[in-house]
Swiss-Prot record:
Species per Swiss-Prot/TrEMBL record: Mus musculus
Protein name: PGC-1 and ERR-induced regulator in muscle protein 1
InterPro entries: Perm1
GO cellular component: cytoplasm; nucleoplasm; nucleus
Keyword Nucleus: yes
Keyword Glycoprotein in annotation: no
Record key words, sorted: Cytoplasm, Methylation, Nucleus, Phosphoprotein, Transcription, Transcription regulation
Residue numbers carrying Phosphothreonine: 534
GO biological process, alphabetically ordered: regulation of DNA-templated transcription; response to muscle activity
């Protein structure tokens, strides 16, 4: 009754619009409540991640199903449910629905609508499987219409859409046999493996009418290809894809490498037969290769072009990681290489099986010998013994594969241009020159040589050392084979057997010349030998245990640049000679400040009377040299007055002095100047001391006899005494005057030093000069005062100098 009543009151279009609107309102409210609003990325891709929980089933549609409708009403409900789920997930795509179509819409206009609707949204509808009712609905939708639906096509305008809908949905789901793993993965991510089984069965049932709609298949295939490019999962291995999701893309797991091998085996035939670019034939490999190397974050950013980086990983007969990290950084590559080579020993035969369609027979032997080389190298020396050979072989192998692969030569040559600067930054210069100078065909022999010789890793220190010394560029014909890498000894000279005929280099250029001859002096490439090797270590052939002869040669070469060291030693003797000169000369003033002060200002305090005269004479000479103008300015008049007074007392003294001159030296020479001052210059004055000298002169004259003689020489004695005092005064007057001035100057200098230190900025950079001068002057003044106090003559010279002008 209910079904009949609704079918009478509502037409098919009105019923579809009503059910879609009612269910849409319910589902949108549920989406808003649960926070599962569709993202813009999901809408653009026409696909969903399958991680959001399914919405609640439409209640009104469920009631209609439980009431048992007819076949036509169930089809209408399925269409409405399909539109509802699709519109709730990708609403901008499904703006055109049944209610917005014009009555005159033809089959061609409605046919692309539902295929596009189904090709975009079945993934979303399948990503949100609900209870058993929704799953049964989807299954009925995929199985096809009832026999009554084609008969009703001419009666209702929407029947072409309904009749096209079952045909369009298999076409929209044609990616299921082509890509069953993706559907299964989404089903597993949403509900589990049981839904994926139902989807696979449905896809298998509808596999027959897939090719009926080529245009719609092209649209759906384009959308699926876009989804595949956005999602980096491969096409052919669904169990490994689920394992990849669970394992988190670990680099060291063998599942990942096996998966790559399976990708190669499945896509190798289409790739090389059709000769299309890699990203067109199977676009998921370029996206999967970054996922493979996501753990090693540095190698991928270093390779600037994603296409050359992904093509060697999909086509070259070597593992993915040994190529890409070795291109970018050799040091980082060898941290990654042991993991990849040791964890995937079984993947090498798979890659070798995938190469015969495109690569010559020489490349088939490369993977067989490569694991021996990579696994035989000790892991304890990843930077020195492993860096140069492994990266060299892998890079050359990459270039060789680029020359052999049909569609990849240009891109890999572009990749090689980017690769070479990065390799040259972490490898010897000779390896870089070898890469740039060799033709492409020559790299084939080098790859075969560098891989099949197991002793290559142990020889890398020699190549690095000699490459640091000499940078050579080798030009080899395309058909010939090359010798060892640049800078090493040739195989003919070292005794090592080579895979191909060894050809001597024809052109070699020397970066810098040294005093010791090098390999470039001989045209055959053999070392001239004796300067490089010490006598204890003759040249020996290289072996797997390592070549001590080559290392000794490098040691000898490393010592060679130290020949200019005698030049440095030539500069060392002058400090030694200066030190010895300082040790020999005790009066050197350039060593320390106290010695400098002792040299300039020091007169040691000596209490012995024997040295006083010499000290006073030295000080007098020093004073006359240092202060001549001062003495002449202050004390010239006093000396002139003194000389006039003495000349007034004895006007005839000069001729008498000549006659009596030989007598005084005997008694006056041993007398010091202070004693002369004490004897002659007292507080009483010069005239009071004159009778004291008379008995001395009388005793001298009494020895000659005669009273007349004693009375006559009185005047000569007085004149002699005046002459002696005058000479003493003339000799002492500069010293007396300077002694006075030196005391005053010392006091003035001490005051000046105190003022300078107090008023200057001691934080300035030049404050040390002021402090140094003030300290030196003050210390000299203090020492002078101490010397004067020790003698006890500080006050008398001043009084005598004041008494002289009074005469």
């Amino acid at each position: 009754m209910d079904n009949f009543q609704y079918s009478v009151q509502l037409s098919d279009r009105e019923w579809a619009e009503f059910s879609a609107t009612a269910d849409e309102c319910g589902l949108l409210q549920a989406d808003l409540a649960s926070g599962d609003e569709p993202l813009s990325s999901d809408i653009d891709q026409g696909d969903s991640s399958g991680s959001s929980p399914p919405g609640p089933p439409p209640l009104f549609t469920g009631q209609l199903v439980s009431q048992g409708r007819g076949q036509q009403s169930r089809e209408l409900e399925d269409v409405a449910a399909q539109q509802l789920v699709s519109r709730s997930q990708c609403e901008p795509v499904l703006a055109l629905e049944a209610s917005h179509q014009v009555a005159g819409t033809s089959t061609q206009s409605e046919a692309p609508l539902f295929p596009s609707l189904d090709s975009v949204c079945p993934g979303q509808a399948l990503s949100f499987p609900g209870p058993a009712t929704c799953r049964d609905k989807m299954q009925r939708l995929l199985q096809g219409p009832a026999p009554s639906s084609p008969s009703k096509a001419p009666h209702s305008p929407e029947s072409p859409g309904h009749s096209d809908n079952p045909q369009s949905s298999p076409d929209s789901l044609e990616a299921s046999p082509r890509n069953p793993g993706r559907k299964k993965r989404r089903a597993v991510g949403a509900k589990g493996t049981k839904h994926s089984g139902s989807l696979d069965s449905a896809a298998t049932q509808m596999s027959s009418p897939q090719l009926t709609r080529p245009k719609e298949a092209l649209m759906s295939g384009t959308l699926m290809a876009k989804a595949q490019q956005d999602k980096p999962q491969p096409d052919s291995t669904s169990p490994e894809q689920m394992a990849r999701e669970e394992s988190g893309l670990d680099l060291s797991t063998p599942i990942l490498i096996t998966e790559q091998d399976q990708i190669r085996k499945t896509s190798r035939a289409a790739l090389h037969v059709v000769s299309k670019p890699v990203q067109e034939v199977h676009p998921d490999v370029p996206m999967a290769s970054p996922n493979v190397s996501t753990r090693a974050s540095k190698p991928q950013p270093d390779v600037a072009l994603p296409k050359p980086a992904s093509k060697p990983q999909s086509d070259i007969a070597s593992s993915t990681h040994p190529f890409t990290p070795d291109v970018s950084l050799s040091t980082l590559a060898f941290k990654c290489q042991p993991n990849t080579n040791q964890s995937t020993p079984a993947s090498e035969p798979d890659m070798a099986l995938s190469t015969p369609a495109s690569e010559p027979d020489t490349a088939l032997s490369t993977p067989a010998s490569e694991p021996d080389t990579a696994l035989s190298t000790p892991a304890s020396e990843p930077d020195t013994a492993l860096s140069t050979p492994a990266s060299r072989s892998q890079l050359v192998k990459a270039e060789f594969a680029s020359a052999c692969t049909p569609g990849l030569h240009v891109d890999l040559s572009a990749a090689g241009s980017e690769i070479k600067p990065e390799v040259s930054s972490s490898m010897p210069a000779a390896v870089d020159v070898l890469r740039t100078d060799l033709p492409r065909s020559v790299s084939k022999t080098e790859s075969k040589e560098s891989v099949s010789i197991p002793v290559k890793p142990s020889l890398s220190p020699i190549s690095q050392a000699e490459a640091a010394m000499v940078d050579t560029g080798v030009s080899v014909p395309p058909g010939g084979s090359i010798e060892k890498p640049a800078g090493q000894f040739s195989a003919g000279s070292s005794g090592e057997s080579c895979l191909g005929p060894v050809q001597a280099p024809k052109k070699k250029k020397v970066r810098f010349s040294m005093a010791i001859p090098s390999h470039e002096d001989s045209g055959s490439g053999e070392p001239t030998g004796s300067p490089f090797l010490t006598p204890e270590q003759p040249p020996v052939p290289r072996t797997a245990a390592g070549s001590r002869g080559g290392s000794a040669a490098w040691d000898a070469v490393a010592v060679a640049p130290r020949l200019p060291q005698p030049r440095i030693l030539k500069h060392l003797p002058p400090p030694v000679s200066s030190v010895s000169a300082e040790a020999e000369s005790g009066n050197c003033f350039a060593v320390t400040l106290p010695e400098a002060y002792e040299f300039f200002f020091c007169d040691t305090i000596e209490e012995e009377d024997e040295d006083v005269e010499d000290e006073e004479a030295a000080s007098q000479a020093l004073d006359e040299v240092q202060w001549p103008d001062t003495c002449e300015f202050f004390f010239r008049d006093s000396r002139a007055q003194r000389s006039r007074c003495q000349r007034g007392h004895s006007p005839v003294s000069p001729p008498r002095a000549d006659t009596v001159a030989p007598v005084p030296p005997e008694g006056l020479v041993p007398i010091s100047i202070p004693e002369v001052y004490e004897h002659f210059f007292t507080e009483e004055g010069f005239g009071h001391r004159q009778p004291a000298a008379t008995p001395m002169q009388t005793s001298e004259l009494s020895r000659e006899g005669g009273l007349e003689a004693s009375t006559k020489p009185v005047s000569p004695t007085a004149e002699h005494l005046s002459l002696t005092v005058r000479k003493a005064g003339e000799l002492r007057s500069p010293l007396t005057s300077f002694t006075f001035s030196q005391n005053d100057m010392c006091l003035v200098f001490v005051a000046f030093a105190t003022w300078a230190v107090r008023t200057s900025d001691l934080q300035a950079p030049d404050a040390w000069k002021t402090v140094l001068l003030a300290n030196i002057g003050t210390i000299s003044a203090i020492r002078y005062f101490r010397r004067q106090v020790g003698r006890g003559h500080s006050g008398r010279p001043r009084s005598s100098s004041s008494s002289n002008p009074s005469c």
